[in-house]
């Protein structure tokens, strides 16, 4: 069926065990899809990424397949996803691969969705009915770079520091 921000998403055991940046989801908790998407965009919540992938596709591996299909549709010729969260690969897993140009293509697609840009430019927001604070991984840039209105940061040892950002100045 059709996916909606109002969908209820039940957290699986697997999603609750994902590390890195997280919102500490617990197995069996239920959230609106909107809340999990907000946590992903604002605070890079890897556990929420897995919960959303499972909700959309049943299994994260099926969602990764959809991610790669969509990347091809967008013309991202040198991108290959092996995870839904971008964390360093575990033993026997491959590292996600992309280029700056391919990430530009993805960013241009995301700009077609105003809610994404609103979330990615939000410095601080609440989660879990106000009991947990989402701090944007871009918070220093949003605060200190005039016109910065969002997108995404990333880091792990093998990939290094990564940034896709947008800014608007003088219209």
List where the protein language model places each region.
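Penicillin-recognizing serine hydrolase domain
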Residues: 58-171
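Active-site-adjacent loops and short helices of periplasmic peptidoglycan-processing enzymes
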Residues: 1-101, 111
């Amino acid at each position: 069926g059709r996916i909606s921000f109002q969908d209820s998403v039940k957290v699986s055991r697997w999603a609750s065990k994902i590390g890195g940046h997280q919102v500490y989801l617990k197995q069996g908790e239920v959230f609106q899809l909107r809340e999990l998407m907000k946590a992903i965009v604002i605070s890079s919540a890897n556990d929420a990424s897995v919960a959303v992938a499972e909700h959309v596709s049943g299994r994260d591996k099926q969602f990764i397949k959809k991610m790669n299909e969509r990347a091809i549709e967008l013309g991202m010729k040198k991108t290959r996803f092996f995870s839904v969260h971008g964390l360093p690969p575990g033993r026997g897993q491959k590292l996600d691969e992309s280029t700056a140009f391919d990430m530009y293509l993805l960013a241009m697609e995301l700009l077609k969705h105003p809610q994404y840009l609103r979330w990615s430019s939000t410095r601080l927001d609440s989660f879990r009915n106000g009991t947990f604070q989402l701090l944007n991984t871009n918070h220093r840039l949003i605060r200190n770079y005039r016109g910065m209105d969002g997108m995404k940061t990333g880091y792990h040892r093998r990939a290094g520091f990564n940034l896709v950002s947008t800014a608007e100045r003088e219209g």
